[in-house]
């Protein structure tokens, strides 16, 4: 991935990201079963409105809701990318983007599914209009490294992680500039 000053839909599309569908449309999308990275984008750059509680599922009894002041502190003005995630193939090669994005969608719809990362997005009033895009990684490329590099690029542009990323990803190679 070539660094840029801003991660936009156009930049990401030029890099091979596709989809750009709301979570509700993921089931009808041709999402690859391969490993890769994905992003959640908010096309609207107006100030966010946060729900008082999250509609997401309570996996292992944990409430995914976050206080509004915590959400506001994590918000990145002018950024459209809200979350960067990864999907590994898994030990048996049965995971990948399709399965991981389905878990994320189901978690947001209230099911008790294990997708704790990125949970902040579900407290946005306009979460139904967020767009999801994905990009398979090459067979010799670790999706955790690709995720780490995208997050590092975002940090270089904005000084902080994307809104819903609470960690910097999983690097498997050397440091990212």
List each model region and its residues.
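Boundary/linker segments flanking structured domains
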Residues: 1-82, 86-177
């Amino acid at each position: 991935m070539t660094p840029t000053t801003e991660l936009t839909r156009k930049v990401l599309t030029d890099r091979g990201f596709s989809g750009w569908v709301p979570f509700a449309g993921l089931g009808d999308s041709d999402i690859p079963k391969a490993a890769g990275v994905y992003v959640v984008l908010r096309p609207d750059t107006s100030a966010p409105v946060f729900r008082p509680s999250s509609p997401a599922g309570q996996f292992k009894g944990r409430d995914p809701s976050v206080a509004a002041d915590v959400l506001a502190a994590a918000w990145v003005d002018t950024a459209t990318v809200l979350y960067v995630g990864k999907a590994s193939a898994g030990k048996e090669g049965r995971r990948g983007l399709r399965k991981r994005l389905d878990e994320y969608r189901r978690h947001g719809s209230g099911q008790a599914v294990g997708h704790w990362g990125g949970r902040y997005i579900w407290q946005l009033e306009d979460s139904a209009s967020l767009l999801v895009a994905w990009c398979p990684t090459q067979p010799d490329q670790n999706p955790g490294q690709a995720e780490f590099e995208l997050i590092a690029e975002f940090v270089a542009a904005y000084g902080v992680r994307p809104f819903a990323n609470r960690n910097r990803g999983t690097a498997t190679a050397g440091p990212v500039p």
